[in-house]
Amino acid sequence: MSTTTPEKPEEIIDATGTSDTAEKIEVVISKEEPAEQKNEVEEPDYAQVPAESEDDAAQELAPTDSAIQVVHVLEAPQKAELVTIPLAHSEAEDHKLADADRDQEEELVFNEERRKTVTMDDNASLRSASITFDANRDEQDLLNESFASNPTDETVLMQKTKDEMDATSERPRSPLDLPPPPASVVLHPSAPPPPPPPLSSTEVVGNTTTTTTTHYAPKTWNDPSITTAPKIPVSLLSGAQPLPSVLTQRTTTSSYSAPNYSASSMSGVPSDVAPPPPLPIPNQSSSSAASYQHHHASSISKSISSSREDLLSEHATSRSTVREIPVHRAPSTAPSHSSVFEYHMMPTTTSTYHHVETPSDEYYRREVMTRTIITRSTEALSQTPLGRPASPLDRYLPYPTTTTTTSGDGRTREEKTVDYKVTYHRDIEEQERRIREDQARRQQEEQDRRDREDNARRILAQREHQEMERLREQQNLSERALAERERADKERLQQERLLRQQREKKRREEWDRLESIRLAEEEAELARRRALEKERIDREKAEEERKTMERLERERARLERERLEEERRQKEKAETERIERERREHERIEIERIERIKRERIERERREREEKKAEEDRLLRERLELERIERERRELEARERQELELQRREAEDRERQRLEDEAREMRRREEERREAELVADVHRQAEERERLRKRQEREEAERLERIRLEQQKIDMERIDAERRERERKEEERREFELIEAARRKKEARDRDRLDEMERERVREEEERREKERREQERRIAAEKERKRRQEEEEEIARLNELQRAAAARQAQRNAELDRQRQRDELDRKAQELSEREMREKERRDRERANEEAQLADLLERERHNQLIRENERREAVERANNRRLEDRRSRDKLDHIVRERSEKEQFELEKRRLLAEKEAMNRKKNHLLSSETLAKLTQPMYYTTREPEVTTKVERQVIERIDRNVWVEDVPYAPSQSAMGYLDNDENNRDRLYNPNDLNRNGSSRSRYQRAKNEKARRDFYHSSQDSADPVTERFRKSTDDLTTRSRPEYRGPLLQKFHDSEFRTTALNETDGLPYRRMGPSPYEQPFAKLLEETERRYAHYNSRASNPSIYQSSRYYYPERHGQPQHTDNTRAESVVAYERESRRESPADQAHIRSRSADYLMDRRIREETEVPENQLQKTRVEPHDQSPRESRISEYEMRFRKSTEKLTVPDWYRENRPQGQTAQTSTYRYGNGVEPMSTTTTTTTVINGTSSHQQAPPPVPPQPIGNIGLPRGMFDRYKDDIEELRRSRSSLHQTGQQETSNRQGSTLSVGGIVDQGHALPGYTVSEVPNAWNLHTSRTSRVVEVADTFVGTSSHEYGNFTNRYGGRVTIEEVLDSIFQKVTPTNQRLNFDRSYPQADELFQGNVDGPGIYTNNYSVMRQVLKSPERAEHILQNEELFVRCTECHRTRELSAARLFFVSCKHCYTYYCSRECRHNNWPNHSGRCSFARINTLCKDVIMKVREDEQAQAFMSKVARDGFSVSGRGSVNIRLSSPQLAQAYVSNGWRALSAYPNDQLLYYYTVKALIAERKEPSLIALCNRYEPREKFILSVSIIADIEHCPETPPPETRELSAVQFSSPRSRYEAIQNQNAPYFSEFAHNV
C-alpha cells in the first residue's frame, strides 16, 4: 500500500550571472512510496519564494501525479548568445520527449530583489572562472580547480572533460541520454516500469526555431554508464542567511516506485492531492569510471533539458536531476541573494548558464538541468579565508559539514555539484490541443467512475431488500406456527377441564348422600351423650359450691383477726408519736431560749469590740498622720535624688536610643530584602501551581472525552436493548392468552377450595362436641384433598413447559434490566465525575483567587511596611533633634529643680501653719454655742408640713437618727489654690452680717433665708435665759442621752434599711439600678412639677411629633429645638420607656416660697443621682447641655445633702429586720414591657396570695396600695410619695409575731407556686405546650406535643367601643387587633427612611422575640393597648404606627409598608419582602408550625360556640365535674390536627365515632396548677359563675419537631438577688429557664 504525500514547491536559485529575464516556476511533485519506507525516508523541507503579485502566485495542477508549470514573463529578457545543441533523434521522438519533459519540469522563480544584490565585482570574477576535470586521476585527487582569465578556456575545458567521461563510461552518444536510476528505486522484477513518453520542446528565438527532443529508451536500470547528481533542498539553509543559487538532493533509501506519466497542460485543473517530492539520491563519487559504476549501478535520474539562456538568468534551478550536457561557454553571474557566503553554511551548488529568449516564448520555456558531481578532499586545498573565497565558485559552492560521504576505503569526502540548464520552447497551439484532450479524457473518466458507483449502489440496495423480505417471511412462518400450537393447547386443556368437571360432579353427589346418612346417626348419638354430660356437670357444680362457702368462711374469720391487730398497733403508734412531739416541742423551746441568750451575749461582746476598735482607730489615725508628714519629707528628698539620677539616665538612654535606631535601620533593610525574596518565591510558587493546574485541566479534558465515548457506547447498547425489549413484549403478548386461561382455571380451583374450607369450618364447629367422629371425617377429607392435589399437580406438570419459557424470558428481561441499571449507574457515575470535576475546577478557581488575594495582600503589606519604615525613619530623625534640644535644656532643668525644692520647703511650712489654724477653727465650730450648732437646732424638721401635729413612728425614728448626727462642713480646695486662700471662707466670716459667699453657695435663696433664721436664733439664745421647759433644749438633751445609752442599730428604721438593701424596686424581672424609680402614688408636691411639665410639653410639642419617628434615635438622644438659629442640646428621655418610672422629685421642681422643705428624703430615694447632685432650678436645667460648653458640670453638694450623707455613712442593718424579714406575704408585682427592634412586647401581671397554705395565680390589673393598719394615715408631706413602702414596712414590723405562725402553716400546707414569668412568645398567648402525659395512655411519637388553647373571653358581648366580639370573633389578642388595623390601612406611595437598628431599644433584658411587628413609640399608649386589646382601634386611631421586618429589622410607616410588606401565612409575623420571609423560615418554622396548631385550636373554639350539640355535651360534663370536684374547666382532647380540621369543617358529627369519655375531660383548678396550664385559664376558673357558664380549653396532639416548651415557673425571688449589670440578670433568668430559652433566641 502506498501513500501520496504532497511536497512543497522548491525554489531553485541561479547564481551564474546577471540577466534581464525574470521568471518564476513552481512545481508540485506527487510521489508514491511504500508504507514500510515512510519511517526510513527523511523528506527535506523545500523552501518556496513568495510571489510578488497575484499573477506570480497562479498555479495550475493536472489531476494526475505529474507536475504542472506556470511561467510568467515579468520583464524583457537579457540578450545573450544562443547555444545550439545538436540532436541525434528523429522528429517523432522529439515530440514524445518534449511531452515527457513538459511533465517533469518546474517553474522558474524570479525574484527581482536578488538581481539587485549582484555586484559588478561578482560578475567579473565569476565570468573569469573555469573548471578543469581530470577523469584519469584517482579519488584523492578528484578535484583540481584552475582559474583563467579567458572565458573561452572554460568552454573548451568543459567540452574536453565531457568527451573524456563519455569515452570512459562507454555510454550511448545520445546527447540527451538519461542517467540510471538510484539504487533506492529499483523496480520489482515482476512489475517492470513502463517506458516514459517522449519529451519534445520547441523554441522560437527571433526567426530561428530550435526543437529539442529527449527520448527515454527502455533499458536496464543497472547500467553502469549512468551517473547521478545529488541535490540539497533549500530547507537546509539557515533562516538568517540568503538562499543559495543551486540546490542539491540526497537519497538515503533503497526503493523506487515507477513514475506515472500522463499528459498534462498548464491550463489543467489541479489535482486534489499534491504530488510528493522526488526520491532523494545518495551522494556518490565520480573520480573514475570504476568508482562511478560502483556507486551508481542502481541509480536513476530524471531528464532535464538545459539551455544557455537559463544559465544566463538569475532564476533558481529545478529539483530534477539532469544528465551532463557539454557547454561551450559559461559566463558566470553573482548569487541572487547576497554576494558574501560562507561555504560551510550553504549547500553545494553548481554554475548555470543562460541565453537570451524572446519575451513571447517565456510562457512555454522549459528547463532541463544537468548535474556534474565533483568531489573534494577534506584537506581543503587552497582554502582562502572565510570572509571572501579566492575562487569565484567558492562563494556559490559551499561545503556544509553535513553533506559528506564515506568512500570504500573509509576516508571522508565532501562533494560539490555543478548544474547546467538548457531551455527549450514549444508551439502554443500544440499545448492547447493537448490540454483540451486531457480535459475531455478526465471528464469521461469521472463520468464512468460515477456510473460504476451508481450501479454498485443500486445492486447493494436490491440485495438488502431481498434479505429483508426473506427475514420477514421467516418471522411470519414462526408466528403462525406458534399460534397454531397455542390454539391446539387451548383446545386440549378445555377438553380436559370438561372431563374433570363431570367426574367431580359425580363424586360430590355420592359424597352428599353418604354425608346425610352419617349426620342422622351422629345426631342420635349426640343427644344421648348430651344428657349424660348434663347430669355429670350438675353434680360437679354442687360439690364446688359447697367447697367455696367453706373457704369464704375461713377467710372472713382471718380478716377480722388481722383488723383487730392493726387497730391495736395504730393506737400504740399514735401514742408514741404524741409523746415524741411533746418532747421535741420542749426541746425546741429550750434551744430557742439558749440561742436567744447566746445572741444577746454575742451582741454585747460585739458592741464592746466596736467601741474598743473605734478608740484604737482614732489613735492609729493620729499616729499615721505624723508618720505621713515625715514620710512626705523623706519622699521629697528621695524625689530630688531620683530626678538627678533621671537626668543621667536620660543621657544614657538617648545614646542607647541612637544606637538602637541604627540597628533598627539595618534590620529594616534586611527585612526588606527578605520580603522581596519572599514575594519572588511566592510568585514562583504561583506559576508552578498554575502550570500544574493547566496540566490537570488538560487531563480532565481527556478524561471527559473518554467518558463521552463511553456514553456513546452506552447509548448504542440502550437502543439495542430497547429493540430487544419490543420483541420480547410482542412474544409476551402472544403468550398472555395461554397464561390467562391457566389463571382462570386456577381461580376456579381456588374458589372450590375456598368453598370446601368454608364447609370444613362448619364441620369443625360440630366436631368440637364429638371428637372421635370428627377425626374420622378429617382423615376422609384429607384423603380427598390429596387426590385433588394430585390431579392439580398433573395439570400443573403440563403447564411447566410454558412456565419455564416464561421464566426464561423473565430471566432475560431481568438481565436486561440489570444491564440497564448498570448503564444508569455508569451514567450516574459519569455525572458525578463531571460534577466532581466541576467542583474541583471551582475549587481551583477559588484557590487561584485566594492566591491572587494573598499576593495582593503581600503587596499591600509590603506597601504598609514601607510606610511604617518611612515613619520610623522620620521619628528617628525627630528623636535625634529632640535629644539635641534636651541636651541644651538640661542645665535649665537643673536650675528649675533647685527652685522647686526651695518652694516646696516654704509650702510645707505654710501647710503646717494652716493645719494648726484649721484645727482651731474646727474646735470653735464644734462648740455648743457656735452658729453651726444653733443652725442645726433651729432648722425645719424633715417631717414638718402644713399639718405638723401628725407624725408617724417611723418618721420620728428616721428624723431623730438624722438629728443626732453632728454636721461638719469641709470645703475642699483645689491644689492650685494659694496658701492664703484657706483663710478666705465662710468660717472666717461667720460673724459678719453680710457674707459674699451667700450669693454663690448652692445658687439658692433658701440658704440665705436659712442663714438669717440661724443668726436670729443665735442672738435670741445669747440674750435669753435658760428655760428648762424649752422643747428644743429638752429634745437635744434627750437625743444626746439616746446616743450614749441605746445601741445604734435600734434607731435604724425600716425605710433606711430598705434603701441600703436596694429594695426600692418595682419589678422582679428587671435590673433597675441606675434607672429612675417609678411613681408610687399621687403627692401634693407633684403639682409644681406637673405645671412645669405641662409648660415644657406645650413648648416642645413639635418634638413630640418628631419623636414618634424611630429614625431620629439612630445617633443621638438629644433633640434640637430652634433657638436663635443654633441647636440646643437637651437630654431626651425617649418618651419614657415602659420600664422607666415616672420619677418626680422636689429637687427637680422650681423653688416654692409657700412650702420650703428639705431635700434629704428625695436624695435618699434616688440612688442614680446620689453621686452627682446639681442645683434644683428646674427640670430643663437638670439635663441641658450648652453647645459651646462640652465639659461636664461640677458637682455642688448642698449643706442638707452633705448633712444627710454624713448621717448615713455608718448605718448598719438592724438585726430585727434581718432576722424577721417578711416571708410568704402578699407580693404584688406589675410589669409592663414593650421592646423595640426584635425585642418583644409583653405584659405580665402576676398576683400571688398565700391564703390558708394555698397559692392561687391570677391575672389582675395593677395593684392597689394597701390600707394602713390601725387607721393611722401618713401626713401629706415629704413622705407622701413613699407612704406605700413605709406602710408595708410598718405592717411587717407590727406583725412580726405572726411570722412564725405563717411559716408553720406554710410548712404544713401544700404550697403551690406559680411563677411570675409567663412569657410564651406572645403578648397574650392563651395557650400552653407540653409533652403528652403518660397518664393519657396514648401511643404517640417522641416528637408529639400537646397544644392547649383556652377560651378566655368571658366578657359581655356589648362594649363601650363597639361589639368587638363580632368584629374579632371573640379572639381579642394584640396580634389579631393590630393585624386587622394593618389590613384596613390604605397604602400610600410614601417612602420613609428605614432604620436597620432597633429604635428606642433599651439595654434591659426583654423576655422574648415574638413581640408584635406593628407598634408605636408612645409607650403610655401601648400600655393601654396591653391592658385592653379590644380598645386598640380606639386608642391607636390618632397614633403613628410602624411595621418592622422580623428578619432584617427594616422599619416602615404603616401606610407605606402596606404596599410591599408581607406576613407569614399562618401567624402574625411581618417581613419587608418574600426574600426575608424565605431567609427567616429556618428560625421561624418551629414557632410557625406551633402557631398553626394554635390557630386551629381557636377555630375549634369558635366552632363550639356555634355548635349547640357540642355545647350540650360539654355543659353536662361541666355540671357533673363541678358537683363532684369543684371549680375547673372542660377540655376537649383531639388526637390529631386532621381530626380537629374535620370537626371545624363538618361539626360534631365528625366526632361521632369517638365516645364522649375519650373526647371531653374535666380538670379542677388544682390539676391545672399541677400541670402548669395557662395562668389566664386558672384565673378564669377561679372567678367564673358555674351556674351560668363553663370554661373550655382545646388540646390538640401534634407531631411538631421543634415545638417550644411552656416555660417553667420561677422558683426563687430574683428581685432579692443583686446583679452587677442587666447582662448578669439575663444570664440568671436564662439559666433558670433553660428549657424555654433553648427553643428561642433572645437579643439583649
Swiss-Prot record:
Principal cellular location given in the protein's record: membrane
Compositional bias of kind Pro residues: 190-199
One GO location term (cellular component): apicolateral plasma membrane
GO biological process entries: cell-cell junction organization; embryo development ending in birth or egg hatching
Sequence positions that bind Zn(2+) 2: C1464, C1467, H1484, C1488
Biased amino acid composition, Low complexity: 254-272, 282-306, 799-814
GO MF terms held by the record: cytoskeletal protein binding; zinc ion binding
Tissue: Expressed by epithelial cells. Expressed in sensory neuron dendritic tips.
Amino acids binding Zn(2+) 1: C1445, C1448, C1472, C1476
Region named Disordered: 1-20, 30-60, 142-339, 381-455, 561-583, 647-678, 744-851, 977-1052, 1122-1198, 1292-1315
Zinc finger motifs (MYND-type), residue ranges: 1445-1488
Residue ranges that the Swiss-Prot or TrEMBL entry lists as coiled coil: 428-924
Ranges of biased composition (kind: Basic and acidic residues): 30-41, 160-174, 307-327, 410-455, 744-791, 815-851, 1012-1022, 1032-1051, 1141-1150, 1164-1173, 1183-1198
PROSITE patterns reported in the protein's UniProt record: ZF_MYND_2
Localization (cell): Apical cell membrane; Cell projection, Cilium; Cell junction, Adherens junction
Keyword terms of this UniProt record: Cell junction, Cell membrane, Cell projection, Coiled coil, Membrane, Metal-binding, Zinc, Zinc-finger
PANTHER family attached to this UniProt entry: APICAL JUNCTION COMPONENT 1 HOMOLOG (PTHR21517:SF3)
Free-text note regarding domains: The coiled-coil domain is sufficient to localize to apical junctions.
Functional note: Controls adherens junction integrity. Required for the correct rate and completion of elongation of the embryos.
Protein name: Apical junction molecule ajm-1
Lineage, highest ranks first: Eukaryota, Metazoa, Ecdysozoa, Nematoda, Chromadorea
